[in-house]
């Protein structure tokens, strides 16, 4: 009874555990195979990446074509019997030659390489093969059209191409140089007439740039002069009794209290309650002809002060004295020597002018 129980427990526990271990070992072997395959693919990809001739190539351009291709073309021309044969071979139909070139193009295009080649590179290779075949066909047609007398010269020319030295072209040899228009011309003849015209064009371009820069500065100065950077508060209607020392530009850009000619001897508190009966401490700068007008204003101010005292009503009109409206030009109460907008504006405009 005990033996059967132990066997049953061992089977119930051991069989699932053994099956699980076997499955885990199978998965581990598959994973190791996958890792090896991926490592091999990575090595091939790195090999293809570091292969300079596989990715960086300008062989489809005539001036930058590799010398190996030229040597291969020369050897194929030597092996081709069309060059050495006479008029009997030259009378062959061109469609047969086109068929041969197509048959040669297919194995070149579909040739499997041990390196990984992207799709765009395959297209470039196909275009390159087609261009080479087209060049071969053109050369063959030109040779066929020549008389048979010149065949010996063609053979000697092709035999001289055997001695072409094969040189391995690196990435630095295949880079296209880019030279800017401005500056010295390294590949130009200094004694040619084109250089003189280029120098004249260059001088005219420099002068044009200088003129455009100067005109743009002048336009900026005009725009800045027409703007008022210090007007943050609404202005009162100007009076006809303004002081003659204040210039007309004060209507557009108000002068600072520091630079003003008419300054108070003792500065008043502008935040105090305005009193219409307060007399101005400014010195009288009007002419003798305006003394009668000042007397009339003083009478009106005294009458208004009496009415304000009788009514005992507070009227907040401005932070300035209402009685001397004809003597005070409106100024920004927050403008001082540190926030002198008009002076800063003038200095900035002067800095823009050409010196």
UniProtKB/Swiss-Prot annotation:
Cytoplasmic side: 30-355
Transmembrane segments: 9-29
A GO biological-process term: cell wall organization
Topology in membrane: Single-pass type III membrane protein
Residue numbers carrying Phosphothreonine: 273
GO cellular component, one term: cellular bud membrane
Chain ranges on the Extracellular side, renumbered to this chain: 1-8
Sequence segments annotated as region (Disordered): 70-114
Family per similarity comment: Belongs to the SKG1 family.
Official protein name in the record: Suppressor of lethality of KEX2 GAS1 double null mutant protein 1
Provenance organism: Saccharomyces cerevisiae (strain RM11-1a)
Gene: SKG1
